[in-house]
């Protein structure tokens, strides 16, 4: 396609459409034109035209974007050209320092990319792209604007060096990053600190925007230096509180100088909030410095300086009124405890005063509950870890936590109770609605609350009694929900959550009988509240209290009910006196009564039903508890009366959202586990249990073919599919599963088949049915190993085949779908079908050979449906949607293992699609997918190798098999690049990547090498010749060692030998490629 834009005016119109245009069509066209411009031979000249003569900043931004994409290509531009681009941009920004900030940023990113990708490039024995540091120093000697540009260059370069590009070998990135760390990063940090000292030494005019910008950029540069991934650990940022900064040993001198920390504390106190929070961010990293950087005296001194800084900030807290400063300071405090032990903290001279200040700061923060809950997380983390460390402190110095921890607990409790009235009266967002944050904070509080537990318990008892009495007064007489009742219910909800929290905080190795007795005192009150609330149903009810009660019951279950329960626990002493609950059997009765009550009265409140059923499910896991549960009357009632009449959530009325039906699977899983305890081979008992479902199915059968009540039928079928999936999941024995199969076949399975055919375009209906079929196909615990006289395995597969074929054929009639519709409407169903098919193929309960033998086409049909669905999915979607990739690739592994005749008889375009999907899957980060790809490739390569090895030796009776193998061989000969590309990918993975499944990679690689020895020799030569002369012989020896003792066959013994050699090879090559970045270059651009 020829370029349509030649003049500057046309290019600027393109920029307008691309960056500020509102017409979507024009923007898409502009994006296409941009890609065309990048591929054009005139790209550089057009970029130069835009930069030098463009009239808008967007023209300059387009030029920078094009240059960035151009220099980032896998096939790099010549060294001279990249040097010219770098020098041109440096001169350009030097001559125009007042460019728009986003243009300067984009141009500097181009310089950073060029520098990183060319870090090891050599001309005339010099690393030509490392001169950037010297170039930047020229900027620093100019005006303030030039100085800012110089700092941004260093900052962007540091960030770029730290940025992992997943499209390139990770080993190459680590090599560049490590070299930059060792040769330049320390100098950059020293330079940045010296600039800050210079700025701080002069009177700072904060009204001067340029000076403010300079300080901001220098602080960002320091932060980028300290955030550098020094050892390639790629720490998960979500685990922020666990971070340790692995500062290199060569930086010790910088960190040992007290002036370094003083500088950043002084900057915090001197700068406005936008800048001071950057200074605090730097201090967070300083506080996170690895312990091993210092010896013991040095560490104590360094900690002392940090504590002094904390004290100074808390004594002058004005800056903490800014949310950014407040958040960073909370992180700073949490990092102190992460990296220093309580025994070290108490030895600091200022510790008593500082812990008092921190306690007061925490109490104030908790009292302002509406302010920055994300920051409070770090404060609670600090106190949680401090209190958790108390049993292990050996120091004689007082830690004072027994004084301050109860105050923190009290502040949390009282502040949450006080918040309720404000939330209700001012109609604010209720913190209790954000359950993720509430649970996280409660989990932290449970440790703190156990310090001086007597005080916590006394406070909670007093508050609970007071609020429960007030609530009872408001209920009698009951005159409807009032503001006062709502407030009281909110306070009780918090108290129940808090009681559950402290009970759940019991630790076996630190608990005492007195503490258990206190847990009993608190638990009594919640059990009494349960009775009070349940007697008022359905007239008065409160969802928040119910959710809190379920939280408490679950915490009590984890702590005091279970297989390892201490029967002598004092928790039951007080409960026995007040409630008559003497042991865990009585508690289980209370649990089950509560569950039945909730399921009966809370049918319209999905959160309560869902949490109740999850609690029931948790109770039903564990044989000892199950034996106790089945003796309880409430359980017997559930097993005989699981209908919508008793449990409204099982109804199909329009009041229930279809998404609410999901909880029915959980209900029937738990219920079936309870049934299984005493079921044995009692078919009558099973039939009685299934009676409500039988009635429902018979109703559906009667009205399915009529045109009325179709919506009701659909909802009934969705509910039934979810119910049966829960039942099937829990039936893990052959006897019980056979009962279910006999109940479903042949009457009800065809009904589900018809539903899929009728409502194939409605995933709310098809997804539950397909998931049920996928569950039925699972041979878990060998439950599908039917008796030898039983045809059930084949009958089940035939039904699955019909359903998959029906769905697969119908879903393709939907045509093209939008990006947001393609997964829910199509790909999700396909992934479930593939999962079901994989379970059938790998289940070992069907002899697939009999289908062809007896002229049954169900097996062939389902394989053809697999192909049709596959060809309707793009390769990118296969890998983009995780559930789809994790069902397709294991299925393909089964097919290549046991059904190679199907694979080799595929039409060439289909076979090419399958092999391409394997090739692309080899490089994915998902080890499940990449391992399946390796295994599938190994089966294909092994088949091909054996065919070639036996060519010409086959007797006449095997001619058909030979012809099938010949077809595959012919395809590979027509497309030699397919296997060559995969060999290249696997070699690249072994040599350059962090290979997490080395054994899997090694298996197909041997076959590929034996089939393509010539191409392997080319790859070997490519790698060896790309290295400096001193390394070439070392690498050549590595390759010789790789094939040493390896024979020309694929026997298990030979494969194992190759796998062992490959492990040594990988280690030796990594050692050979590892070089001192100061001395010699090493190109790692071998294979793409």
Swiss-Prot record:
Provide the primary localization: cytoplasm
Give the matching InterPro entries: ARM-like, ARM-type_fold, Importin-beta_N, XPO4/7-like
Any idea which UniProt keywords this protein has? Acetylation, Cytoplasm, mRNA transport, Nuclear pore complex, Nucleus, Phosphoprotein, Protein transport, Translocation, Transport
Report one GO cellular component.
cytoplasm
Q: Which domain of life is it from?
A: Eukaryota
Q: Could you tell me which residues carry Phosphoserine?
A: 569
Q: Where in the cell is it found?
A: Cytoplasm; Nucleus; Nucleus, Nuclear pore complex
Specify whether Phosphoprotein is a keyword of the entry.
yes
Gene Ontology process terms (BP): mRNA transport; protein export from nucleus; protein import into nucleus
* Residues carrying N-acetylalanine: 2
A molecular function (GO) held by this record is:
GTP binding
User: Which tissue types show expression of this protein?
Assistant: Highly expressed in testis, moderately in pancreas and weakly in other tissues studied.
Tell me the Pfam families matching this sequence. IBN_N
> Where does this protein have coiled-coil stretches?
none
Q: What SUPFAM superfamilies does its record include?
A: ARM repeat (SSF48371)
Q: What does this gene product do?
A: May function as a nuclear transport receptor.
Which family does the UniProt entry place this protein in?
Belongs to the exportin family.
Q: How does it assemble?
A: Binds to nucleoporins and the GTP-bound form of Ran.
Instruction: Please report the name of this protein according to its UniProt entry.
Output: Ran-binding protein 17
């Amino acid at each position: 396609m020829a370029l349509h834009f030649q003049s500057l005016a046309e290019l600027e119109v393109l920029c307008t459409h691309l960056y500020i245009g509102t017409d979507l069509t024009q923007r898409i066209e502009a994006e296409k034109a941009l890609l065309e411009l990048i591929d054009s031979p005139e790209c550089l000249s057009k970029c130069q035209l835009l930069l030098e003569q463009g009239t808008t900043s967007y023209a300059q931004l387009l030029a920078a974007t094009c240059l960035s994409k151009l220099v980032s290509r896998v096939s790099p531009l010549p060294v001279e050209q990249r040097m010219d681009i770098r020098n041109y941009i440096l001169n350009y920004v030097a001559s125009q320092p007042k460019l728009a900030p986003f243009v300067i940023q984009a141009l500097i990113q181009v310089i950073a990319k060029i520098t990183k990708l060319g870090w090891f490039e050599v001309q005339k024995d010099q690393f030509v792209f490392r001169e950037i540091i010297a170039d930047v120093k020229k900027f620093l000697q100019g005006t303030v604007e030039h100085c800012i540009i110089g700092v941004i260059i260093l900052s962007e370069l540091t960030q770029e060096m730290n940025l992992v590009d997943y499209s390139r070998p990770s080993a190459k990135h680590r090599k560049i990053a490590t070299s930059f760390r060792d040769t330049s990063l320390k100098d950059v940090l020293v330079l940045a600190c010296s600039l800050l000292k210079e700025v701080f030494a002069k009177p700072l005019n904060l009204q001067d925007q340029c000076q403010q910008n300079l300080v901001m950029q220098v602080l960002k540069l320091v932060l980028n230096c300290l955030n550098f991934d020094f050892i390639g650990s790629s720490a998960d940022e979500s685990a922020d509180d666990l971070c340790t900064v692995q500062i290199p040993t060569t930086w010790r001198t910088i960190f040992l100088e007290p002036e370094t920390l003083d500088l950043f504390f002084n900057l915090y106190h001197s700068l406005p909030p936008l800048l001071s929070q950057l200074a605090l961010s730097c201090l967070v990293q300083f506080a996170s410095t690895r312990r091993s950087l210092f010896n013991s005296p040095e560490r104590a001194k360094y900690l002392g300086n940090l504590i002094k800084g904390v004290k100074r900030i808390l004594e002058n807290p004005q800056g903490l009124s800014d949310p950014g400063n407040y958040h960073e300071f909370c992180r700073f405090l949490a990092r102190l405890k992460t990296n220093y032990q309580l025994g070290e903290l108490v030895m600091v001279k200022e510790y008593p005063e500082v812990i008092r200040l921190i306690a007061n700061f925490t109490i104030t923060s908790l009292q302002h509950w509406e302010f920055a809950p994300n920051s409070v997380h770090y404060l609670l983390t600090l106190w949680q870890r401090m209190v958790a460390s108390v049993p292990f402190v050996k120091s004689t110095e007082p830690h004072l936590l027994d004084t301050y921890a109860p105050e923190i607990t009290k502040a949390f409790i009282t502040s949450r109770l006080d918040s309720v009235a404000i939330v209700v009266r001012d109609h604010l967002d209720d913190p209790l609605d954000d359950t993720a944050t509430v649970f996280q904070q409660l989990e932290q509080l449970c440790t703190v609350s156990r310090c001086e537990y007597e005080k916590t318990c006394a406070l909670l008892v007093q508050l609970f009694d007071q609020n429960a009495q007030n609530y009872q007064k408001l209920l009698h007489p009951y005159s409807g929900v009032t503001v006062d009742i709502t407030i009281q219910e909110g306070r009780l909800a918090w108290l129940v959550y808090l009681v559950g929290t402290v009970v759940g905080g019991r630790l076996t190795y630190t608990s005492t009988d007195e503490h258990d007795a206190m847990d009993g005192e608190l638990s009594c009150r919640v059990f009494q509240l349960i009775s009070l609330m349940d007697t008022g149903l359905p007239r008065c009810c409160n969802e928040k209290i119910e959710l809190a009660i379920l939280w408490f019951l679950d915490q009590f279950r984890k702590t005091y009910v279970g297989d390892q329960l201490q029967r002598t626990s004092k928790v039951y002493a007080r409960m026995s006196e007040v409630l008559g609950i003497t042991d865990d059997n009585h508690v289980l009765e209370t649990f089950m009564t509560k569950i039945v009550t909730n399921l009966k009265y809370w049918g319209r409140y999905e959160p309560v039903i869902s949490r109740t059923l999850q609690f029931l499910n948790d109770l039903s896991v564990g044989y000892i508890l199950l034996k106790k549960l089945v003796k309880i009357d409430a359980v017997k009632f559930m097993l005989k009366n699981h209908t919508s009449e008793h449990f409204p959530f099982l109804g199909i009325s329009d009041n229930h959202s279809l998404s609410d039906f999901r909880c029915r699977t959980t209900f029937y899983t738990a219920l079936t586990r309870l049934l299984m305890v005493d079921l044995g081979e009692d078919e009558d008992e099973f039939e009685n249990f299934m009676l409500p479902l039988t009635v429902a199915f018979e109703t559906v059968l009667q009205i399915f073919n009529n045109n009325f009540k179709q919506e009701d039928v659909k909802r009934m079928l969705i509910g039934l599919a979810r119910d049966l999936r829960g039942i099937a999941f829990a039936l893990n024995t052959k006897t019980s599963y056979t009962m279910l199969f006999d109940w479903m076949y042949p009457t009800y399975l065809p009904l589900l088949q018809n539903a899929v055919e009728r409502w194939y375009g409605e995933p709310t209906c098809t997804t539950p049915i397909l998931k049920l079929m996928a569950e039925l196909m699972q041979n878990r615990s060998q439950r599908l190993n039917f008796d030898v006289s039983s045809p059930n395995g084949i009958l089940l597969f035939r039904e699955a085949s019909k359903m998959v074929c029906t769905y697969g054929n119908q879903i393709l009639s939907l045509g093209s779908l939008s990006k947001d519709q393609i997964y829910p409407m199509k790909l999700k169903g396909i992934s479930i079908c593939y999962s079901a098919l994989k379970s059938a193929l790998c289940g070992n309960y069907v002899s697939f050979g009999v289908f062809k033998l007896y002229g049954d086409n169900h097996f062939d049909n389902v394989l053809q449906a697999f192909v049709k669905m596959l060809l309707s999915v793009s390769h990118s979607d296969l890998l983009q949607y995780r559930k789809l990739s994790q069902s397709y690739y294991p299925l393909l592994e089964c097919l290549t293992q046991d059904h190679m005749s199907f694979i080799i008889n595929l039409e060439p375009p289909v076979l090419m699609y399958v092999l391409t999907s394997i090739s692309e899957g080899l490089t994915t980060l998902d080890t499940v997918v990449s391992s399946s790809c390796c295994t599938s490739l190994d089966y294909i390569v092994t088949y091909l190798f054996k065919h070639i090895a036996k060519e010409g030796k086959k007797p006449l009776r095997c001619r058909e098999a030979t012809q099938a193998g010949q077809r595959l061989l012919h395809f590979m000969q027509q497309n030699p690049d397919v296997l060559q590309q995969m060999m290249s990918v696997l070699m690249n993975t072994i040599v350059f990547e962090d290979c997490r499944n080395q054994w899997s990679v090694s298996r197909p690689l041997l076959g590929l090498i034996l089939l393509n020895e010539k191409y392997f020799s080319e790859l070997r030569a490519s790698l060896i010749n790309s290295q400096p002369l001193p390394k070439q012989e070392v690498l050549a020896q590595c390759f010789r060692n790789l094939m040493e003792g390896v024979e020309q066959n694929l026997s298990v013994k030979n494969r194992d030998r190759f796998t062992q050699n490959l492990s040594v090879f990988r280690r030796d090559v990594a050692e050979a490629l590892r070089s001192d970045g100061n001395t010699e270059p090493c190109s790692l651009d071998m294979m793409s």
